[in-house]
From Swiss-Prot:
It comes from the Eukaryota. This is Zyxin. The lineage of its organism: Eukaryota, Metazoa, Chordata, Craniata, Vertebrata. One of its GO terms (molecular function) is metal ion binding. Residues 255-275 have a biased composition (Low complexity). PANTHER family: ZYXIN, ZYXIN/TRIP6. Belongs to the zyxin/ajuba family. The modification N6-acetyllysine is found at K256, K263, K270. Residues 234-243, 294-310 have a biased composition (Polar residues). Residues 63-78, 93-109, 174-189, 197-214 have a biased composition (Pro residues). It is found in: Cytoplasm; Cytoplasm, Cytoskeleton; Cell junction, Focal adhesion; Nucleus. The modification Phosphoserine is found at S117, S144, S170, S171, S272, S300, S336.
Length: 564
């Protein structure tokens, strides 16, 4: 039968060993395991004793102890309490089934020789590898079980390569649980006594060394169904009580398994990092089952099973993320119009225009340089490209032709001055400059021109006090010498006949005000009567001046002197 089983054996082997690995007695419980088929990879060498015992108790479904939560098998559960504990444990892939149900399973009878095929759980998960062959494969002899284990290991290897678990998890489909026929035993009922899963697993594993290799694949399968049995599948216990025949009726609890699958995936992810160490002290919790099998079993087979389960879980998460790609496509669509839109074309056109303009700008100066074939600015002879030339005053000259306009000195590499469009050396240019009327030096910088002469600004000063006259009023005397206003009045202004002071303009004024009477000059303040000192008016009225014998008098004093 090993040859026809390969496909179905993949699922069957995954489920059956998970439950019956520690003790061959629980091998018939494979029916509930198919639901957990995503956990197939562990079939190669899962923890033989511990995992198998718990798997048998919680997952097998053959015996009444399997709780409804752990096993969503169609048959009604015989033991509700045990089912509940197993269901909680089954929720997480790594945790083994509840200890109560698991303890009875470890003492599984040798009748496990009848090894049911777990294809129905694969179909429930919706994995492509799930075999359609639900009928269990009875194996009454231990030797046949060994052969079946070998076939299961090969099938599990094929399943790991194909990764059917991802498809199963992603689909989320939970086919009705089909329990393969198995031989139930009274050991399953003492599930309450098996609350402590660790001791029972250890004892059965030690008692029966040969069934342990079979239990390794069973433990992995058992952990997987536990993830699903979050839905309380009481029919699992009934399936345990029922013989192999009722396993075919498992499809009824399919809806329960469907919710279990999603729960299992998150639990597995949580458990996968520290499954073997942490959950050991908590046998009732979902995390506990994985710890017990790891401690009881050799340990080498169980880690691969967990890793395989973890790998399966990762694909599940990826499948959940797959629906997200459409928004990414929408983003790409938005970007696509922005990137390849007309804006990019316009920018390209602008760049092309700029490059063309730059090329044209560069070509024009090159053309000018090409047109350098000009004639000399002095001799009008053409200039050869290889011949050195001097560019000055906007023209080109032969080196021998670029000379001073006056002394004919070559000016190449020297400072020169331009005067009326002709080059001059520094000496000749200085000779052409005007000289200051005061110091006689050529004026090379600023020049002040006054009275028809050129001066340095600092040389144009008053001839009396030498104060600078730039920007101020000045008066020139008869010798054409500049004077400041005060010095000029002091020297040339008329003097008052009374005070003998020069008559000067008042401060802030440029005009001079004076009174002339009897051929004499007076200040306004000095024009008054000589006898009484009364100010006289410049008007011809009674307050005016009444001269008498050369004296300036008022009318009253004039009358008094005239009577005498």
């Amino acid at each position: 039968m090993a040859a026809p089983r390969p496909p179905p054996a993949i699922s069957v082997s995954v489920s059956a060993p998970a439950f019956y690995a520690p003790q061959k007695k629980f091998a018939p419980v494979v029916a509930p395991k198919p639901k957990v088929n995503p956990f197939r990879p562990g079939d190669s060498e899962p923890p033989v004793a511990a995992g198998a015992q718990r798997a048998q108790m919680g997952r097998v479904g053959e015996i009444p102890p399997p709780p409804p939560e752990d096993f969503p098998l169609p048959p009604p559960p015989l033991i509700g309490e045990g089912d509940d504990s197993e269901g909680a444990l089954g929720g997480a892939f790594p945790p083994p089934p509840p200890p109560m149900i698991e303890e009875p399973f470890p003492p599984a009878p040798l009748e496990e020789d009848i090894f049911p095929s777990p294809p129905p759980p694969l179909e429930e998960e919706g994995g492509p590898e799930a075999p359609t062959q639900l009928p269990p494969q009875p194996r009454e002899k231990v030797c046949s079980i060994d052969l079946e284990i070998d076939s299961l290991s090969s099938l599990l290897d094929d399943m790991t390569k194909n990764d059917p678990f991802k498809a199963r998890v992603s689909s989320g489909y939970v086919p009705p649980p089909v329990a393969t026929p198995f031989v139930p035993k009274p050991s399953t009922k003492p599930a309450p006594g098996g609350t402590a899963p660790l001791p029972p697993w250890k004892t059965p594993s030690s008692s029966q060394p040969p069934p342990q290799p079979q239990a390794k694949p069973q433990v992995q399968l058992h952990v997987q169904p536990q993830a699903k049995p979050h839905v309380q599948p009481q029919p699992v216990s009934s399936a345990n009580t029922q013989p192999r025949g009722p396993l075919s009726q498992a499809p009824t609890p399919a809806p329960k398994f469907a919710p279990v699958a999603p729960k299992f995936t998150p639990v597995v992810s949580k458990f996968s990092p520290g499954a073997p160490s942490g959950p050991g002290p908590q046998p009732n919790q979902k995390m506990v089952p994985p710890d017990a099998p790891s401690s009881v079993s050799t340990g080498s087979p169980q880690p691969p099973s967990f890793t395989y389960a973890q790998q399966k879980e990762k694909p599940l998460v990826q499948e959940k993320q797959h629906p997200q790609p459409p928004p990414a496509q929408n983003q790409n669509q938005v970007r696509s119009p922005g990137g390849p839109g007309p804006l990019t074309l316009k920018e390209v056109e602008e760049l092309e225009q700029l490059t063309q303009q730059l090329m044209q700008d560069m070509e024009h100066p090159q053309r000018q340089s090409v047109a350098v074939n000009e004639s000399c600015g002095k001799c009008n002879q053409p200039l050869a490209r290889a011949q050195p030339a001097v560019r000055a005053l906007g023209q080109l000259f032969h080196i021998t032709c670029f000379t001073c306009h006056q002394c004919q000195q070559q000016l190449q590499g020297q400072q020169f001055y331009s005067l009326e469009g002709a080059p001059y050396c520094e000496g000749c240019y200085t000779d052409t400059l005007e000289k200051c009327n005061t110091c006689g030096q050529p004026i090379t910088d600023r020049m002040l021109r006054a009275t028809g002469k050129a001066y340095h600004p600092q040389c144009f000063t008053c001839v009396v006090c030498a104060c600078p006259l730039e920007g101020t009023s000045f008066i020139v005397d008869q010798a054409n010498q500049p004077h400041c206003v005060p010095d000029y009045h002091k020297q040339y202004a008329p003097r008052c006949s009374v005070c003998s002071e020069p008559i000067m303009p008042e401060p802030g004024r440029d005009e001079t005000v004076r009174v002339v009477a009897l051929d004499k000059n007076f200040h306004m303040k000095c024009y008054k009567c000589e006898d009484c000192g009364k100010p006289l008016s410049i008007e011809a009225d009674d307050n005016g001046c009444f001269p008498l014998d050369g004296h300036v008098l008022c009318r009253k004093c004039h009358s008094a002197r005239a009577q005498t």
